[in-house]
Curated annotation (Swiss-Prot):
Phylogenetic classification of the source organism: Bacteria, Pseudomonadati, Pseudomonadota, Gammaproteobacteria, Thiotrichales
Keyword line: Ribonucleoprotein, Ribosomal protein
Gene: rplS
Species annotation: Francisella tularensis subsp. tularensis (strain SCHU S4 / Schu 4)
GO MF annotation, one: structural constituent of ribosome
Protein family according to the UniProt entry: Belongs to the bacterial ribosomal protein bL19 family.
GO biological process: one example: translation
PANTHER family to which the protein is assigned, alphabetical: LARGE RIBOSOMAL SUBUNIT PROTEIN BL19M, RIBOSOMAL PROTEIN L19
Record-level GO cellular component terms: cytosolic large ribosomal subunit
Name this protein carries in UniProt: Large ribosomal subunit protein bL19
Length: 115
């Protein structure tokens, strides 16, 4: 059981502007990157490998293929560095964690699209 004050502070920091998404969905995460004294938005486009719902400590992992190499990146859902999340395709998967996709390539790595 958490302290009521801690719950109140955490609730005030939760983001409500992000769309609903699930494992398997193809998304683009636009996040702020700081290079020297400049800031810019960088897009990371891939599919959601896993999602962890823990209130303020929620996180999700996005996987993409870059130059034939699999790249995974984990984001904190309520991070102020995330500018926006765009859901491009909804997927129809039967698992909550898609770790088996790491070993698949080509046609075997396709995800069925939700109609």
């Amino acid at each position: 059981m958490k302290n009521k004050f801690v719950e109140l502070v955490e609730k005030s920091q939760l983001r409500t502007d992000l769309p609903e998404f699930n494992p398997g969905d193809s998304i683009t995460v636009n996040l702020w990157i700081k290079e020297g004294d400049k800031q810019r938005i960088q897009a990371f486009k891939g599919f959601v490998l896993r999602k962890r719902n823990r209130g303020l400590h929620s996180a999700f992992t996005v996987r993409k293929m870059s130059s034939g190499m699999g790249v995974e990146r984990t984001f904190q859902t309520h991070s102020p560095l995330i500018d926006s999340i765009i859901v491009e395709k909804r997927a129809d998967v039967r698992r909550a964690k898609l770790y088996y996709m790491r070993g698949l390539t080509g046609r075997a790595a396709r995800i069925k699209e939700k109609v």
